[in-house]
């Protein structure tokens, strides 16, 4: 059996980066112990990823924290390279590993590959023009009735945002580029996406995430600012 993901890393990193693996016996023991939590399908998925971030020790790819720090928004994509279906599936699996309020998992994902559809999104959405040049886009949608009472219904925004971050990090880990372009809460943008993608009532698009192989390499920004940290109280 190939290297096995340390389940402790998977569960602790809400930003599940596809393919982070360990070969230590402790990792295997943890994977078996957490089998009831992770499930057979998820365990096989995380242990079998070969294209993305494989392991810290092989020296070819970054560890989790480095991957988080080096992720950047990509707005230009290589038109000649098609994103493999296997990578798209891994990205979506990573998205569905996100946390959600009361484990309601209110998300739905529309994978857009049709060039005409991508062009429509780019034309109708001011922040999503880059979708025209992308190989695909994932539109993250949430259920407006997630089964939670009162203001809890609004938690779909948090849940789908967590899933969206997983998408960005998984894409980065698989050698792809992606960018989060906002839809919600703009009413005109929401209406446009509903129309183009035939999104049913009861669901709202949070964003459009164009994805493809990068055709640019912008500098990584150092966003660390200790002045933003407050100890015990503001």
Regions found by a protein language model. Give the residues of each.
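Bacterial N-terminal signal peptides that target proteins for export
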Residues: 1-7
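Sec-dependent N-terminal signal peptides
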Residues: 7-13
